[in-house]
A protein has these predicted regions:
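Intrinsic-disorder/low-complexity regions
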Residues: 1, 18, 38, 103-104
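Bacterial N-terminal signal peptides that target proteins for export
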Residues: 1-8
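Hydrophobic h-region of N-terminal signal peptides that target proteins for export
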Residues: 11-20
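Non-cytosolic coordination micro-motifs
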Residues: 21-98, 129-225
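A glycine-rich, hydrophobic loop/mini-helix early in the fold
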Residues: 96-128
Length: 225
């Protein structure tokens, strides 16, 4: 049963908080990011615009189901041993209030292992009106920044905006952080190889509508004289 508990901790991004270290690049195989056009055959109650598949999650599509739950004596755990599609999960299981599945700024989503590229960590979704309008994918920073950037270019093409910045760690080590934005007709992707600490990076994936909301929010928070 301990291995199942470990899977749950990994899915919720909790392993890093209890002292586990990310595997070395030589210890894991790189997996390609899956960013494909969504199936154009949609149900009648879905919006007609095309969505994007990213890490097996449809950005612009309906919210995925909750991860499979296994009931145990005195509680329950998520059973991710035979996960076939992405699903959402919550850290408090059924002990606390259920998460808001209509509108949520940070709902944890668990991709299937074959859709999780090496170097990615916790994935959270922005849910608007029951649909996934955005994804926030945390990464391990400098360790796989350039590999992830290459994979994103393979799937999305040449970035709309591209650059690099030098980041210095607390002990004086210097790292190169790739930065890129893909502003495409049906998806917006912002990749930051290193954010804050050198072992932390970020990928933001938004629908055009969500990107417009984010831009408006940032503009409203901008301070001036």
């Amino acid at each position: 049963m301990e291995w199942r508990k470990s899977l749950v901790l990994l899915a919720l991004g909790a392993i890093g908080t209890v002292g586990a270290q990310a595997p070395a690049p030589s210890e894991v195989k790189r997996q390609a990011i899956s960013v494909e056009k969504a199936n154009t055959s949609r149900r009648s109650d879905e919006r007609p615009n095309t969505g994007f598949e990213f890490m097996g999650i449809f950005v612009g599509g309906r919210l995925v189901r909750e991860c499979p739950v296994e009931q145990l004596y005195g509680g329950a755990i998520y059973d991710l041993s035979s996960l076939e599609t992405a699903c959402w999960a919550t850290s408090n299981m059924r002990q606390g209030p259920r998460p808001n599945l209509r509108n949520n700024d940070a709902l944890t989503v668990v991709p299937v292992s074959k859709k999780r590229p090496t170097g990615t960590r916790t994935v959270t979704a922005v849910v608007e009106d029951g649909r996934i309008e955005g994804l926030r994918v945390e990464t391990d920073g400098f360790q796989h920044a350039h590999q992830l950037f290459e994979q994103l270019q393979q799937k999305l093409g040449k970035p709309t905006i591209q650059g690099t910045s030098d980041v210095v760690s607390g002990v004086g080590a210097k790292f190169s952080s790739p930065e890129a934005v893909w502003n495409l007709p049906n998806v917006y992707v912002h990749f930051s190889g290193i954010v804050g600490a050198v072992d932390s990076g970020l990928i933001l994936v938004y629908t055009p509508e969500q990107q417009a909301r984010e831009a408006a929010r940032q503009k409203a928070q901008t301070k001036s004289f």
